[in-house]
From Swiss-Prot:
SMART domains given in the database record: DnaJ
CXXCXGXG motif repeats: 144-151, 161-168, 183-190, 197-204
Name of the protein in its database record: Chaperone protein DnaJ
Domain J positions: 5-70
Any one Pfam family match given in the protein's UniProt record, by short name: DnaJ
GO terms under biological process: chaperone cofactor-dependent protein refolding; DNA replication; protein refolding; response to heat
Residues annotated to bind Zn(2+) 2: C161, C164, C183, C186
Family: Belongs to the DnaJ family.
Reported cofactor(s): Zn(2+)
Alphabetical UniProt keywords: Chaperone, Cytoplasm, DNA replication, Metal-binding, Repeat, Stress response, Zinc, Zinc-finger
Amino acid sequence: MAKQDYYEILGVSKTAEEREIRKAYKRLAMKYHPDRNQGDKEAEAKFKEIKEAYEVLTDSQKRAAYDQYGHAAFEQGGMGGGGFGGGADFSDIFGDVFGDIFGGGRGRQRAARGADLRYNMELTLEEAVRGVTKEIRIPTLEECDVCHGSGAKPGTQPQTCPTCHGSGQVQMRQGFFAVQQTCPHCQGRGTLIKDPCNKCHGHGRVERSKTLSVKIPAGVDTGDRIRLAGEGEAGEHGAPAGDLYVQVQVKQHPIFEREGNNLYCEVPINFAMAALGGEIEVPTLDGRVKLKVPGETQTGKLFRMRGKGVKSVRGGAQGDLLCRVVVETQIGLDEKDKQLLHELHESYGGPTGEHNSPRSKSFFDGVKKFFDDLTR
């Protein structure tokens, strides 16, 4: 049975940011957790699927491999022998959820990692094929340079929370059960800021715009993402920063169309060139090259120019340029031209092209047979 798509399992889009994935995971894990569905085998299987999808989609390397190859990326030990069994620290997801419900509190919450950011970058085809370095300016939250992320006024320190005594959790009794909950006073941090920093007002972060130099590798295409680790928003109170994802969008080109690593273009030629053959110049991304057109060439014929396409960003052979010939009907003919064409037309045997146009003859023969069959 084919495995379900990881994004569909979590109910998120393929461009979802990490915080969206975490939010979806929390909601589904709560619903299907074995402690809430004891003896329900279907819920247990669903929970395993959710857990597996979460582990892949929150790991940037695994997610990139999955986006490119799907489930095949992890077959035959593709996950380094570990599979999906362990290795992910699910306490950071469940601590504030299942700790509150089942009493399995994990103590003080860690300060939240900074949010990931996304920047949409538009490139020309030439830039995408050759690679380019671009400067971008993004609005973000950066660590406060006065309190260095602590949120406290310089010369002071955050104070231990008097409600939870620094544990980040409080215990509530409900009948025979003792249930641990996140401390409502400090929101689980275990500390309070009595003298907040004047610049960030106790948040530890300030709004700023920053300029980054982004190196785009040669061969990228629409939909590719480039990850800049640690260039997202600063984390809360000194926690690690998030990442910045640059999403590539390649503009439409007036001459070339790209399909994978191959480029396509249409090359118009006149009737005489198509009939007699000859040599023409065609464009490539590296300049003009000569193309030999044989006689009796028809519209739609493809000529392949090897190695004139795109070099894959993931390595491998360079693609090709495929030129599709379009035989163009001449316009602006004078009387002499028309007379010559009339004579040529008659020499072909009229509209059926009996002698020189086998496709025309075949077409008209087919039309005649069609009407003959109708009148029988």
